[in-house]
């Protein structure tokens, strides 16, 4: 447990600490544990023995740097070397060599891995902890049925249940169950041992009849009976060694291995003293569990809450990597066995290096990082996103739940989450409640449990100590919430405070409190802790805000928030986007690409990140903050990164906002903005896209990168250099060639020119033609070329193609259709950009920058935005920044409102502007219509909230189709922007058009523009030469498809005309 000596002081732990600790545990303990399980191997004649010496393993320095691994699409990894020995027993000789086992991906300073040039992160998983759990359910008759569920380390489940006659059964499958006596006998206990080790032997004897005695008469009979019920085998199976192995593999290995954590939980729940290194289920465990189940039936003992965090364990990066390393060693073992037997068969002399290959380990880790659901591509939209992604907790994944089967109870907040899992920050949609986020101070304990820190309140010692409590321990203490921090120290003993005890919230006297919270942010995740005045918001809107802050785009001119919570500096520091001085010294050179530091007689060059692309195409860039000649100390910030200012997180801008309706343009949360935000680049961001092309060696010859591309217009090739690659700094438009490439292919006989046929006939020369396969800039990709990388991998074969990467930067101003949001879940789409002179203006003549809909506040109950808006106005006028911790009402009633009004009053006094704070309507002000100059009828709330521009931008979403591809079966246009798809006119849209009687438009939609093949071909020709489009004569392709499908069901669809003369109805019959 961590104890902090400083009285009443605690520091926020590093936000990436959980990832670092997990990877260190894998390197320090996991590797040794798995290598020690590697068996000694002998050949069939037992003449050669191979073994690994675990005591001496080495991890070599990485061969490449992180930056090079990203650009060259390689894995940032370290080679693992282990000493191995080969013993010849007949000659009594041993050959020892240090061999390469394989490459292990390394974690970098961000807590992430670089695999094939892509930043990836392994998130933590929450699983049901192995052990035994007792539940009670009502059967169809309304009678309580008690069950005990044993969960193995692999997630397999076995159930014990007790029926009305107090008989105990072990359920081995969904339909089959066997007597507890048969299970215990199959595990090696006889009847006397069973009766000696239970508390209720008379209950066990009560259902012991002659048939049961025969089943448990011997271990072989019990195993046969168990196997017959488990495998649902009919007849009379014969006892054999293979039958035992099959049962061991299918049942006992999967459902009876408890592991270290499961053994500890089993001992605690059943009051056993079995050694913790005995990790398998024993007959003694089964009998103790049955005793406890009988006690439950008689009303003794307590049932288990399966959703309590004390019954969960965290599967961290250490556990996942250790599992994969163990799997790789099993594969390596099979390879070594096969190599030994092959060498003996061919009478070769093996060496340790010849026996071991690095392929199993390398491929296993590459497969894990590429395919495992818990290994995800790092979201690097902004610095906050990077940190939050590594602190996620997921119930999904192997051995966990699925989004469709998880119940509401599992998704819901549990009292044990308090201080460990954020009750607010979770994903929206089908995974709500299944993907959470760690609270700020939470950490993973040695047994996989989540621990939260508290201050211990001791009567004997006045010194405050900080302890980390696990979910199973804090049940036994009275835990005071953050409200107790505000108590007057002199009269604490007389105060009554809210506290938590055994998952209940109580109000108790101060002297009864054992522990108290250490921090007002303790219960929330990083995203939720960055929301000012969060206590005034509805939790649903706070959830949206914590998700939307992760979607904020870094702006070209960042600005830190006027109103914050104080956590912004820590987030920026731990995100890794800042350049930090590693030791003190003097700056002797500074530039946009590097800073040179002189200290202790050594010169250190610190490279800066310049226009680096993130996974979400945002621009990561560092800007120097220290002038040349200045002395710096260790830990001082040398350069700001993307979305940081002065070492603080800066995701958005403080803009002047009015909450008022304006001609209906902010209907349904739409937002009006001033043209100032466009022309002054207030919300301008840079986005970098990567385009790549590979060159292969085909069967007709190698592909060629060249600038000489036939049959293409010259203006498309204008930006290519002599090698056929686009020049740095070129401005490129849609359709331009970025890389010129020709692919060789053999031409058909009929396509040869006469002179080619002559050459072929006389000289026998094979004439080949080339196909143009250039890299072209797709729609919406216009911009400036900022980098070109030509990566030539070793070998140069078709399996290692050369790759060319082209990076293009786009400058995007804010425009109609972009999404903006505040920090309180108030989001909206920009509906119109008004001229500055048309925007409403304040009494000092300043036009507002944005207009929000006031109806978005009362129904959403996110009143925190009003506090932030008004306090931001005071801060902008007084040139102040505020850092306010949440729940300030614990100090005084209406503390937030009093703070805002006092600051507005002071701003009004200092600026001599009485309109800033008017007592009749505090926080509001009379503003004027920019078009007419008349004041609006009602006073309006104005202020400077912090508004973010989100990554959902109209340039990435807007799409139109003139022509494109068609589906092969239905012949209708494809769906989606990526496939150049069309807009579907479905059944309900057809009804809408029918309602207006637009027959010709409807016919166009269903024929020419859709799936009438002949008619849509005629449209093109008619459009070029002019004239009317002919009506389609036959049915469209989708109707023909329906007819064909009916024929496949042996239904023939015919049509014929019924004349009025032959069309008669017998009205009497009808």
UniProtKB/Swiss-Prot annotation:
Subcellular location: Plastid, Chloroplast
SUPFAM superfamilies, A to Z: beta and beta-prime subunits of DNA dependent RNA-polymerase
Predominant location: plastid
The protein's Enzyme Commission number: 2.7.7.6
Catalytic activity: RNA(n) + a ribonucleoside 5'-triphosphate = RNA(n+1) + diphosphate
MF term (GO), any: DNA binding
Organism domain of life: Eukaryota
GO cellular component, one term: chloroplast
InterPro entries associated with the record: DNA-dir_RNA_pol_bsu_ext_1_sf, DNA-dir_RNA_pol_su2, DNA-dir_RNAP_su2_dom, DNA-dir_RNAP_su2_hyb_sf, RNA_pol_bsu_bac, RNA_pol_bsu_CS, RNA_pol_bsu_protrusion, RNA_pol_Rpb2_2
UniProt entry keywords in alphabetical sequence: Chloroplast, DNA-directed RNA polymerase, Nucleotidyltransferase, Plastid, Transcription, Transferase
Gene Ontology terms: biological process: DNA-templated transcription
Similarity-based family: Belongs to the RNA polymerase beta chain family.
PANTHER family registered for this protein in UniProt: DNA-DIRECTED RNA POLYMERASE I SUBUNIT 2
Quaternary structure and interacting proteins, as annotated: In plastids the minimal PEP RNA polymerase catalytic core is composed of four subunits: alpha, beta, beta', and beta''. When a (nuclear-encoded) sigma factor is associated with the core the holoenzyme is formed, which can initiate transcription.
Function: DNA-dependent RNA polymerase catalyzes the transcription of DNA into RNA using the four ribonucleoside triphosphates as substrates.
Protein name: DNA-directed RNA polymerase subunit beta
């Amino acid at each position: 447990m961590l104890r902090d000596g400083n009285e009443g002081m605690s520091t926020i732990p590093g936000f990436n600490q959980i990832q670092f600790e997990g990877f260190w545990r894998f390197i320090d303990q996991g590797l040794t544990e798995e290598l020690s399980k590697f068996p000694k191997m002998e050949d069939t004649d037992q003449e050669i023995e191979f073994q690994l010496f675990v005591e001496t393993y080495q991890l070599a320095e990485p061969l490449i740097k992180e930056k090079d691994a990203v650009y060259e699409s390689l894995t940032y990894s370290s080679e693992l070397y282990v000493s191995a020995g080969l013993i010849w027993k007949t000659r009594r000789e041993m050959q020892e060599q240090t061999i390469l086992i394989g490459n292990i991906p390394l974690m970098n300073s961000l807590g992430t891995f670089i695999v094939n040039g892509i930043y990836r992160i392994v998130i933590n998983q929450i699983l049901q902890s192995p052990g035994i759990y007792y539940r009670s359910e009502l059967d169809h008759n309304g009678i309580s049925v008690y069950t005990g569920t044993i969960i193995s380390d692999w997630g397999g489940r076995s159930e014990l249940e007790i029926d009305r006659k107090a008989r105990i059964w072990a359920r081995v499958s969904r339909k089959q169950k066997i007597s507890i006596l048969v299970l215990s006998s199959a595990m090696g206990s006889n009847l006397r041992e069973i009766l000696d080790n239970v508390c209720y032997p008379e209950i066990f004897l009560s259902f012991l009849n002659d048939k049961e005695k025969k089943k448990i008469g011997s271990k072989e009979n019990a195993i046969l009976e168990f196997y017959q019920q488990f495998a649902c085998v009919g007849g009379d199976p014969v006892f054999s060694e293979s039958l035992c192995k099959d049962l061991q593999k299918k049942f006992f290995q999967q459902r009876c291995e408890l592991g270290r954590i499961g053994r500890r939980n089993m001992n605690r729940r059943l009051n056993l003293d079995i050694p913790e290194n005995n990790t398998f289920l024993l007959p003694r465990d089964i009998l103790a569990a049955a005793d406890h189940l009988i006690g439950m039936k008689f009303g003794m003992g307590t049932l288990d809450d399966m959703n309590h965090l004390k019954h969960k364990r965290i599967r961290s990066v250490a556990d996942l990597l250790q599992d994969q390393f163990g799997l790789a060693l099993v594969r390596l073992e099979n390879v070594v066995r096969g190599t030994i037997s092959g060498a003996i068969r061919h009478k070769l002399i093996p060496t340790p290096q010849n026996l071991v290959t690095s392929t199993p380990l390398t491929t296993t880790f590459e497969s894990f990082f590429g395919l495992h659901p818990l290994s995800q591509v790092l979201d690097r939209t902004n610095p906050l996103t990077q940190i939050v992604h590594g602190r996620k907790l997921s119930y999904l994944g192997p051995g966990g739940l699925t989004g469709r089967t998880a119940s509401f109870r599992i998704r819901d907040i549990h009292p044990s989450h308090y201080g460990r899992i954020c009750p607010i920050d979770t994903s929206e949609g089908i995974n709500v409640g299944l993907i959470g986020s760690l609270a700020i101070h939470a950490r993973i304990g040695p047994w996989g449990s989540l621990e939260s820190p508290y201050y211990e309140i001791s009567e004997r010692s006045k010194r405050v100590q900080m302890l980390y409590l696990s979910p199973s321990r804090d049940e036994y203490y009275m835990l005071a919430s953050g409200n107790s921090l505000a108590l007057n120290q002199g009269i604490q003993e007389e105060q009554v405070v809210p506290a938590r005890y055994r998952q209940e919230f109580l109000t108790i006297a101060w002297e009864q409190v054992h522990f108290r919270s250490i921090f007002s942010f303790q219960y929330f995740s990083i995203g939720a802790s960055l929301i000012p005045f969060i206590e005034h918001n509805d939790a649903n809107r706070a959830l949206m805000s914590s998700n939307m802050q992760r979607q904020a785009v870094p702006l070209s001119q960042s600005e830190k928030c006027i109103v914050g919570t104080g956590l912004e500096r820590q987030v920026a520091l731990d995100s890794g986007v800042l350049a930090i001085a590693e030791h003190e010294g003097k700056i002797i050179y500074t530039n946009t690409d590097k800073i040179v530091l002189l200290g202790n007689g050594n010169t250190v060059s610190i490279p800066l990140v310049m226009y680096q692309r993130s996974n979400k195409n945002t621009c990561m860039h560092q800007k120097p903050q220290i002038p040349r000649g200045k002395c710096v100390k260790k830990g001082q910030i040398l350069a700001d990164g993307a979305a940081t200012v002065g070492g603080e997180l800066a995701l958005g801008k403080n803009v002047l906002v009015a909450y008022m309706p304006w001609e209906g343009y902010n209907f349904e949360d739409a937002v009006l903005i001033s043209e100032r935000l466009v022309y002054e680049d207030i919300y301008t961001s840079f986005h970098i896209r990567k385009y790549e092309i590979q060159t292969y060696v085909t069967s007709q010859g190698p592909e060629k990168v060249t600038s000489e591309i036939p049959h293409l217009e010259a203006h498309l090739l204008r930006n290519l250099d002599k090698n056929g690659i686009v020049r740095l700094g070129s401005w490129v438009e849609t359709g331009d060639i970025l890389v010129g490439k020709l692919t060789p292919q053999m031409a058909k006989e009929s396509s040869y020119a006469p002179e080619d046929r002559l050459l072929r006939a006389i000289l026998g020369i094979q004439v080949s033609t080339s196909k143009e396969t250039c890299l072209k800039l797709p729609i919406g990709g216009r911009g400036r070329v900022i980098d070109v990388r030509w990566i030539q991998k070793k070998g140069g074969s078709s399996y290692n193609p050369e790759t060319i990467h082209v990076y293009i930067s786009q400058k995007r101003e804010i425009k109609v259709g972009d999404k903006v949001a505040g920090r309180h879940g108030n989001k909206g789409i920009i509906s119109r950009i008004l001229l500055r002179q048309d925007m409403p203006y304040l009494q000092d003549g300043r036009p507002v920058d944005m207009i929000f809909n006031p109806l978005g506040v009362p129904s959403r109950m996110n009143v925190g935005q009003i506090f932030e808006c008004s306090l931001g106005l005071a801060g902008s006028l007084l040139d102040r920044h505020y850092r306010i911790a949440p729940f300030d009402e614990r100090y005084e009633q209406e503390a937030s409102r009093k703070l805002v009004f006092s600051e507005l009053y002071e701003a009004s006094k200092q600026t001599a502007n009485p309109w800033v704070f008017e007592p009749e309507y505090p926080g509001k002000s009379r503003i004027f219509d920019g078009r007419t100059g008349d004041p609006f009828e009602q006073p309006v709330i104005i202020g400077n909230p912090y508004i973010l521009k989100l990554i959902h931008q109209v340039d990435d979403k807007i799409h139109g189709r003139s022509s494109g591809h068609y589906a092969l079966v239905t012949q209708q246009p494809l769906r989606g922007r990526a496939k150049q798809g069309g807009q579907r006119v479905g059944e309900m849209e057809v009804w809408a058009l029918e309602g207006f009687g637009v027959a010709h438009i409807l016919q166009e939609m269903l024929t020419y523009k859709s799936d009438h093949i002949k008619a849509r071909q005629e449209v093109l020709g008619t459009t070029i030469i002019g004239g009317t489009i002919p009506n389609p004569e036959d049915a469209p392709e989708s109707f023909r498809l329906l007819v064909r499908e009916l024929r496949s069901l042996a239904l023939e669809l015919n049509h014929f005309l019924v004349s009025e003369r032959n069309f008669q109805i017998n009205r009497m019959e009808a």
